[in-house]
């Protein structure tokens, strides 16, 4: 290339990637432009430089002035527009030239000449190219249109002269339809193309859409490069394209006429660059007529390249280079040397879109959770997508152009279909199956490719159309992801008993994915036959108005609707199994289970909603065997529960003895805050055995961090929360007892308002109950598989094992090794029948003990034999907590006896020996940090507006942390910028790193926000208790917000520094350091991260434990003085916080309405009460006093179990006026209590 050295690509998606490949081949430097939704797009990664466009994303790619300005600033020589957007904008082409740059495309005059279809027809006529019989110029009235239509003969087509892409045209078969359509086409032309002009053409119902590729040098020389057929269209949008045309192949004499006419037309206007002349070819006569000329590169240009061995983009760039060099264009001799004879072989292209085939192919944005193209010899896939990319609603949903080139048309069809059926795209629905069925169609294979081909094409789907998603419907499988850890949620069904039995009844493996339905269910339209089973809590369900029996195998016919209503009794979750599961759902770490709190797994990492699309098995057995579980085998779902639990890990020494008794003796109530991430209990307050949480925090329930077990009873302050499937795997609060594995399924069915008691159980009885439960499920599975009667199965025991008395109950500590020399005290604490927590030492936080955890974890991870990751060990969570340092071991208690595990761990302790002089491998990271950020300010503002208006830590978290530790703000910032923060654990939610300063003089302490925030931006640097944390995703949180940095997680593992098998960045004993940046510089680096181009700065180092221990010894007295100052400052801040908290609580109470007022109003016969339908939290009040209500109007939105429940004005309240609002946002309310009083007129 002589003059074209730098190229700006003014486009996105696959065409931008396609251009980049040729530009790189020609050693042209490339500049990409992109919008925020496209930040992670492939063209951004591949370009030499990428510039973020400003303005609304939907308009940024057509902001010609901005794009030209970028090109000039960045030293571009030319701009290539691709197709769409600015590619056929003559004003843009002219502006590019005026800026001294080359427009890689035809001249503005050529674009204008063919921009309006009626003038293009005139040019074609002058060039001797036959046109479709029609009007001469534009038609200005209905009467004129009718007259012309009558002279042409019906059917006719009304076309907007500025239209394109199948928009702005209608077919008319009668005079009446012409009159009805005239105004419609005019208005569409004006709305879509700013031009209301229209013309009329004769419509040929049996025709082909065939186009000829041309290339001109702008000096009167043009060549044709064969034809393509694009007859397979939906709503005039191309779906399948072929080169050569099968119709032309059968009528070879037609090729010369088509190509010669195309060349004449291009040469008649001195066309320069690539262009396409489109024809309508009558199937009966073989006559061809000019339709339009596209003055740009076509989407389907690739199949021409495959059959003719040319690179059309290269030709366009060489033409631009010649123009820049002053030669006006390529030499005629050069064009003549390009081989343009008969095509070599056959190529077919299929356009793959993210679109819903059951919703009229509506575009479907969303995250592509898996992308796996099958590529073979002969294939070419032009795409911009990959695993993890988000398809934006702002742009065309084209994902890829899949092409296949072969020696014959039949081989090309077979090869392309093989690619389509062998490729896998999970996330929003696509048209892959639709395209494959077209290729399998006998008429298509025979070459009968008329433009009306798809009018009557039948696409047989094996899928479910989600009409409505229900209150909270998730895809789950069993057992979920027990081995991932790092805060990515265990996931899986909350009630695994009902889930597994549902699968067994339909004939699935018990762990196959199904639907978990909470409180009220979805409405599903089955597009193909299916076999289903609905199990779990009693719930109303109908199949085309016929009741659906629960705990039964049910056959569903194509077209039937399953409507699952509300739960009707005890329990809150039901499970729907479908034979074959849902093949289009991607696996993440080997599971399809949804973890909605961290946005992974399932359908887009979220609950189902209207418009979602689930594929199902197309292979349905013909057998009509009915199968139902006998009533006496169906589990019971009461509203009062008793759950077996075991002490530990932190009972004695944390809770006072009388509070341990209280836990078992009290009757607890399930709060409205009962969800997959935690089930809060209402009941008596505990007495604590210690005054505070030490380095973990001011409250005795606080720890620095420790591992959490599923089923743990965790104390967040004085309130207990049970941790179910989606709970964090570590945190900073005491877990005193743990519900045993045999009773975890019951947690999935407790609902707000239910009563609950705990029963102390021995390990022996726990394992017996667990084996009994597994035997029960196994027996049912075998009967379902063999078709046997269920009569031999023993029901689940209705009674629990004998409760242990306070005198026979044991401590959570099941074994200890005394301190000896440099080997610390080791305490082994049980957490139910599947978890064991190993504690090291007694005293303040000590990295020596934390390294011992790391060393133990390494030995266990590499172990082989009876106790190993492949044999009974499930997961390991290393933490640092209040006094000791700990490792939580998650193991299978049915495979490894607890005592055997303890014995093995004791042996390892002996082998570890003295680690006080160890040299520990470490990585030291250097991250940007800005203390001032709009993201952080907005999060605090949101908190103050919606949660708590004032507190000791508001409005400035940084100032609070400084004052709480007797520092100035400058001193606190200096700590952040000079300290090395040691990562002591990675977990909680989404691999959040928790770290402490290595130098004890730089350690701090501060309370967490109360209440916790509902929103924290990703990248937030925060402090809570004694720890620093970096929030890796947008999430709730309670640590004080002190600055912003780069997050350390990429969920699908596609960004630099990550991998699908390791989507987290930080590991234990990594070190984090910060350097200060401005907010502007931070946003620049964050944009690099979001686009996948950020390069983390880190180095491999050794952490010397001996040197660290010397530091601890040398600074001991200095640290004591620092702690004394900090304790004094913290005491002052504690007093302030108590005062502000009491004032806030009082103000909230005063905003309520007195019961005397309520009772007085209720005496009025015209007053009607709108009640809360369930125990919940008031989220929003949607009306105000004095409003008149409409029927079904939403008056209040409640939040319960992480669900939004809309309370509506039913018919009795329709027309009434709101008299008194009793519910206030943020307040809890019980089922049946009044939300507001309304007065009927």
Curated annotation (Swiss-Prot):
| Annotated binding of ATP, by residue | 117, 201
Q: Please tell me whether the keyword Transmembrane helix is annotated for this protein.
A: no
Q: Which of the seven top EC classes does this enzyme belong to?
A: ligase
Provide this UniProt record's keywords sorted from A to Z: ATP-binding, Biotin, Hydrolase, Ligase, Nucleotide-binding
What triggers or suppresses the expression of this protein? By beta-alanine.
- Give the EC number: 6.3.4.6
Residues modified as N6-biotinyllysine are 1202
Q: What cofactor requirement does the entry state? A: biotin
TM region(s), chain numbering? none
Which segments constitute the Biotin carboxylation domain? 3-459
CDD domains recorded:
biotinyl_domain
ATP-grasp domain segment(s): 121-321
| Example GO molecular function | hydrolase activity
The Biotinyl-binding domain extends over 1159-1239
Pfam families given in the database record: Biotin_carb_C (PF02785), Biotin_carb_N (PF00289), Biotin_lipoyl (PF00364), CPSase_L_D2 (PF02786), CT_A_B (PF02626), CT_C_D (PF02682)
Task: List, alphabetically, the SUPFAM superfamilies matched.
Answer: Cyclophilin-like (SSF50891), Glutathione synthetase ATP-binding domain-like (SSF56059), PH0987 N-terminal domain-like (SSF160467), PreATP-grasp domain (SSF52440), Rudiment single hybrid motif (SSF51246), Single hybrid motif (SSF51230)
- Which Gene3D superfamilies does this entry report, sorted A to Z? 2.40.50.100, 3.30.1360.40, ATP-grasp fold, B domain, Cyclophilin-like
Q: Which cysteines are joined by disulfide bonds?
A: none
Catalyzes what?
urea + hydrogencarbonate + ATP = urea-1-carboxylate + ADP + phosphate + H(+)
Please explain the role this protein plays, according to its UniProt record.
Involved in the utilization of lactams. Required for the conversion of exogenous 2-pyrrolidinone (gamma-butyrolactam) to endogenous gamma-amino-n-butyrate (GABA).
List the PANTHER family.
CARBOXYLASE:PYRUVATE/ACETYL-COA/PROPIONYL-COA CARBOXYLASE, UREA AMIDOLYASE
Q: What is this protein called?
A: Putative urea carboxylase
Organism (species): Emericella nidulans (strain FGSC A4 / ATCC 38163 / CBS 112.46 / NRRL 194 / M139) (Aspergillus nidulans)
């Amino acid at each position: 290339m002589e003059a074209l050295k730098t190229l700006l690509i003014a486009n996105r998606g696959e065409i931008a990637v396609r251009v980049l490949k040729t530009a790189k081949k020609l050693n042209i430097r490339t500049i990409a432009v992109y919008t925020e939704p496209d930040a992670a797009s492939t063209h951004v990664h591949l370009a030499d430089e990428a510039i973020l466009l400003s303005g609304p994303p939907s308009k940024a790619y057509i902001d010609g002035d901005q794009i030209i300005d970028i090109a000039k600033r960045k030293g571009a020589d030319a701009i290539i527009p691709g197709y769409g957007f600015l590619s056929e904008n003559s004003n843009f082409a002219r502006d590019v030239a005026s800026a001294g740059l080359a427009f890689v495309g035809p001249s503005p005059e050529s674009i204008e000449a063919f921009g309006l279809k009626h003038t293009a027809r005139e040019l074609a006529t002058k060039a001797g190219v036959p046109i479709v019989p029609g009007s001469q110029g534009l038609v200005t009235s209905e009467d004129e249109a009718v007259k012309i239509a009558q002279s042409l003969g019906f059917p006719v087509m009304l076309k907007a002269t500025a239209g394109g892409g199948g928009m702005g045209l209608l077919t008319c078969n009668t005079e009446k339809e012409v009159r009805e359509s005239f105004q419609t086409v005019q208005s569409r032309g004006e709305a879509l193309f700013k031009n209301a002009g229209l013309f009329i053409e004769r419509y040929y119902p049996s025709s082909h859409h065939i186009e000829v590729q041309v290339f001109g040098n702008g000096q009167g020389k043009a060549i044709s490069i064969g034809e393509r057929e694009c007859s397979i269209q939906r709503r005039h949008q191309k779906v399948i394209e072929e080169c050569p045309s099968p119709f032309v192949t059968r009528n070879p004499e037609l090729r010369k006429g088509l190509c010669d006419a195309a060349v004449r037309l291009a040469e008649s206007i001195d066309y320069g660059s690539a262009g396409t002349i489109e024809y309508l070819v009558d199937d009966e006569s073989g006559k061809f007529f000019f339709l339009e000329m596209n003055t740009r590169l076509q989407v389907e240009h690739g199949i021409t390249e495959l059959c003719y061995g040319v690179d059309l983009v290269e030709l366009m760039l060489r033409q631009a280079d010649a123009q820049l060099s002053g030669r006006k264009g390529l030499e005629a001799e050069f064009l003549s040397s390009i081989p343009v004879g008969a095509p070599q072989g056959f190529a077919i292209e299929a356009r793959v879109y993210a679109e819903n085939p059951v919703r009229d192919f509506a575009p479907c944005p969303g995250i592509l959770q898996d992308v796996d193209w099958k590529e073979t010899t002969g294939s070419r896939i032009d795409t911009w997508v990959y695993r993890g990319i988000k398809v934006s609603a702002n742009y065309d949903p084209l994902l890829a152009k899949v092409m296949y080139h072969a020696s014959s048309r039949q081989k090309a069809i077979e090869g392309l279909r093989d690619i389509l059926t062998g490729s896998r795209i999970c996330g929003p629905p696509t048209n892959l199956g639709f395209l494959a069925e077209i290729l399998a169609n006998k008429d298509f294979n025979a070459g009968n490719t008329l433009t009306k081909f798809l009018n009557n094409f039948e696409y047989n789907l094996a899928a479910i159309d989600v009409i409505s998603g229900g209150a909270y419907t998730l895809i789950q499988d069993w057992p979920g992801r027990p081995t991932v850890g790092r805060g990515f949620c265990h996931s899986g069904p909350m009630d695994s008993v009902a889930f597994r039995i549902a699968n067994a009844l339909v004939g699935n493996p018990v762990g196959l994915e199904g639907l978990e339905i909470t409180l009220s269910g979805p409405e599903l339209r089955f597009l193909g036959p299916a076999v289903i089973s609905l199990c779990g809590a009693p719930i109303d369900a109908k199949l085309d108005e016929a009741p659906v029996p629960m705990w039964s195998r049910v056959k569903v016919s194509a077209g039937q609707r399953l409507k699952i209503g509300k739960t009707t009794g005890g329990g809150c979750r039901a499970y729907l199994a479908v034979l074959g599961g849902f093949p289009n759902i991607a696996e993440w770490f080997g599971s399809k289970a949804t973890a909605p709190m961290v946005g992974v797994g399932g359908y887009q990492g979220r609950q189902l909603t209207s418009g979602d699309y689930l594929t199902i098995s197309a292979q349905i057995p013909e057998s009509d065997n009915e199968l139902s579980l006998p009533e006496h085998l169906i589990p019971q779902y009461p509203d009062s529960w008793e759950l077996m639990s075991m002490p530990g890990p932190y009972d004695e020494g944390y809770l006072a003895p009388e509070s341990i008794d209280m836990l078992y003796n009290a009757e607890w109530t399930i709060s409205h805050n009962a969800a997959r991430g935690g089930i809060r209990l209402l009941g008596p307050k505990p007495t604590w055995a210690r005054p505070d949480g030490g380095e973990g925090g001011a409250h005795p329930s606080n720890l620095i961090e420790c591992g959490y077990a599923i089923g743990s009873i965790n104390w967040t302050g004085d309130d207990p929360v049970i941790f179910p499937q989606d709970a964090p795997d570590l945190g900073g609060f005491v877990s005193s007892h743990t519900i045993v594995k045999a009773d975890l399924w019951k947690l999935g069915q407790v609902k707000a308002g239910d009563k609950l008691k705990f029963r102390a159980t021995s390990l022996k009885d726990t394992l017996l109950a667990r084996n009994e439960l597994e035997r029960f499920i196994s027996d049912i599975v075998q009967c379902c598989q063999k078709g046997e009667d269920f009569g031999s199965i023993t029901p689940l025991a209705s009674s629990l094992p004998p409760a242990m008395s306070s005198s026979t109950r044991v401590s959570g500590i099941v074994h200890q090794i005394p301190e000896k020399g440099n080997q610390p005290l080791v305490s082994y604490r049980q957490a139910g029948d599947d978890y064991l927590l190993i504690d090291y030492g007694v005293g303040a936080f000590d990295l020596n003990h934390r390294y011992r955890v790391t060393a133990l974890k390494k030995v266990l991870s590499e172990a082989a034999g009876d106790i190993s990751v492949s044999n009974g060990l499930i997961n390991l969570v290393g933490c640092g907590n209040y006094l000791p340092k700990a490792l939580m071991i998650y193991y299978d208690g049915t495979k490894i006896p607890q005592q055997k595990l303890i014995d093995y761990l004791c042996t390892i302790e002996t082998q570890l020996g003295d680690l006080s002089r160890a040299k520990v491998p470490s990585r030291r990271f250097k991250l940007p940090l800005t203390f001032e950020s709009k993201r952080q300010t907005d999060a605090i503002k949101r908190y103050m507006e919606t949660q708590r208006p004032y507190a000791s830590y508001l409005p400035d978290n940084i100032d609070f942390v400084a004052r709480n530790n007797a520092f100035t703000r400058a001193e606190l910032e200096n700590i952040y910028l000079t300290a090395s923060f040691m990562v002591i654990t990675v977990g909680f939610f989404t691999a959040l790193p928790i770290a402490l300063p290595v130098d004890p003089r730089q350690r701090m302490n501060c309370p967490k926000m109360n209440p916790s925030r509902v929103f924290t931006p990703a990248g937030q640097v925060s402090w809570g208790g004694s720890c620093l944390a970096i929030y890796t995703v947008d999430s709730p949180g309670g640590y004080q917000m002190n600055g912003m940095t780069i997050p350390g997680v990429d969920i699908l593992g596609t960004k630099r520094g990550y991998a699908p098998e390791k989507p987290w960045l930080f590991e234990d004993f990594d070190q984090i350091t910060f350097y200060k940046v401005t907010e502007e510089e931070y946003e620049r680096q964050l944009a690099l991260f979001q686009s996948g181009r950020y390069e983390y700065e880190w180095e491999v180092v050794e952490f010397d434990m001996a040197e660290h221990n010397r530091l601890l010894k040398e600074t001991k007295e200095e640290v004591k003085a620092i702690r004394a100052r900090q304790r004094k400052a913290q005491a002052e801040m504690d007093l302030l916080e108590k005062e502000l908290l009491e004032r806030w609580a009082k103000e909230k109470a005063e905003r309520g309405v007195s019961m005397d007022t309520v009772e007085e109003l209720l005496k009025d016969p015209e007053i009607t009460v709108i009640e809360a339908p369930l125990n919940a939290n008031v989220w929003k009040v949607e009306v105000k006093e004095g409003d008149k209500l409409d029927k079904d109007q939403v008056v209040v939105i409640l939040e319960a179990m992480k669900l939004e429940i809309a309370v509506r004005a039913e018919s009795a309240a329709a027309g009434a006026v709101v008299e008194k609002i009793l519910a206030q946002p943020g307040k809890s309310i019980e089922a049946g209590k009044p939300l507001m009083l309304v007065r009927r007129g």
